[in-house]
């Protein structure tokens, strides 16, 4: 069957397309072309993708099926399907930006596309590749045990007082944490050094090449409680009946459990130099899709307030600066976005290349 194609996917095949340039763009023409194509499969690591796909289908009359799949499984599937010529996933939303940049894009297995009509609203740093949404991972405390966050400086987490009392996912199994370490070194090492001086009243003296490496080594040496999930970390901090004074580093999405009475999480604020970091999700069109226009239309939809709304409920932040979080989002992170370290994909390949080094630093420094 002949397939109407507004713009062949091959035209988009620059490995890193860069921020969208001003160009003629006709959304109505894209919709019409998408409606003439086969349906699409869209994959994300959150179950909210099911709701997004259903709403997209109703809005545009283009069939879309959403599937939840972990980032590692998505990466493997894209490579396998591209090599076999049997593409099943048309759009992938991967919450491991460095891996997507390191494994998929250089080989041309998947392509980043920024909707030209929305480019002016999207943070320029989030366009190469396109970061659709970001999940805040933030310092938390138990509001039943503390009137306010007991942490005022990231270096507080290295104090004997907090030995074994920080709950977080294991960096050896959660790449977003080693990426955070590398992002700090690449973009905020001076702030880490300044925070040390602010806390201890003297400049940091270290044999390590950077302040961030000194911080990570000290943090690991203080024996955080390492978990295999956000849920386990959040429970350690603020589950009902918890009497141990833990603090945690968890996803803002866990604050949903406050409303259900399962947790009593509080959001830390005014921590020097930041309260956490953003873990971003990249949106890519898979090479070989039979429905390139439908795939592009879904990317466009995901970059609108209507399209990303289901994920906004979990505190996930759109890269479209005109899109606001819901007023009733449980964590209250919208008031503190300036206090988190945003992900900068300009050093994404460096994050990818240095994961093993950061894991080695953590492994060699960790003491329980």
Annotate the PLM regions.
Residues 43-54, 67-79, 87-238:
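Extracytoplasmic ligand-binding site segments that recognize negatively charged/polar headgroups
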Residues 98-103, 238, 243-266:
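A ligand-binding cleft/hinge motif common to bilobed small-molecule-binding domains
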Residues 121-122, 134-137, 213-219, 261-287:
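Periplasmic-binding protein-like
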């Amino acid at each position: 069957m002949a397939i109407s194609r507004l713009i062949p996917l091959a035209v988009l095949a620059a490995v890193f397309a860069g921020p969208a340039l001003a160009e003629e763009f006709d959304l109505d023409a894209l919709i019409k072309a998408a409606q003439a194509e086969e349906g699409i499969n869209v994959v994300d690591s959150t179950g909210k993708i099911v709701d997004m796909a259903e709403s997209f289908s109703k809005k545009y009359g283009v069939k879309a099926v959403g599937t939840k799949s972990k980032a590692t499984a998505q990466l493997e599937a894209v490579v396998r399907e591209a090599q076999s010529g049997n593409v099943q996933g048309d759009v992938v939303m991967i919450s491991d930006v460095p891996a997507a940049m390191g494994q998929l894009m250089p080989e041309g297995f998947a392509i980043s596309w920024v909707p030209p009509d929305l480019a002016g609203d999207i943070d320029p740093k989030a366009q190469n590749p396109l970061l659709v949404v970001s999940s805040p991972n933030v310092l938390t405390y138990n509001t039943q045990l503390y009137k306010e966050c007991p942490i005022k400086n990231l270096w507080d987490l290295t104090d004997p007082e907090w030995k074994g009392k920080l709950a977080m996912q294991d960096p050896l199994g959660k790449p977003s944490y080693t990426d955070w370490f590398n992002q700090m070194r690449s973009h905020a090492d001076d702030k880490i050094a300044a925070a040390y001086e602010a806390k201890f009243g003297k400049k940091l003296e270290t044999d390590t090449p950077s302040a961030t490496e000194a911080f990570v080594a000290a943090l690991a040496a203080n024996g955080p409680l390492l978990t295999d999930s956000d849920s386990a970390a959040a429970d350690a901090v603020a589950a009902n009946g918890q009497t141990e004074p833990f603090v945690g580093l968890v996803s803002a999405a866990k604050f949903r459990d406050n409303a259900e009475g399962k947790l009593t999480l509080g959001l830390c604020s005014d921590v020097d130099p930041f309260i956490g970091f953003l873990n971003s999700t990249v949106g890519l069109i898979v090479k070989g899709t039979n429905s390139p226009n439908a795939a592009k239309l879904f990317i466009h939809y995901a970059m609108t307030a209507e399209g990303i709304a289901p994920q906004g409920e979990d505190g996930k932040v759109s890269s479209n600066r005109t899109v606001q979080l819901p007023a009733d989002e449980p964590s209250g992170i919208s008031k503190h976005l300036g206090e988190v370290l945003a992900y900068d994909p300009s050093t994404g390949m460096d994050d990818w290349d240095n994961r093993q080094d950061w894991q080695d630093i953590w492994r060699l420094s960790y003491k329980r």
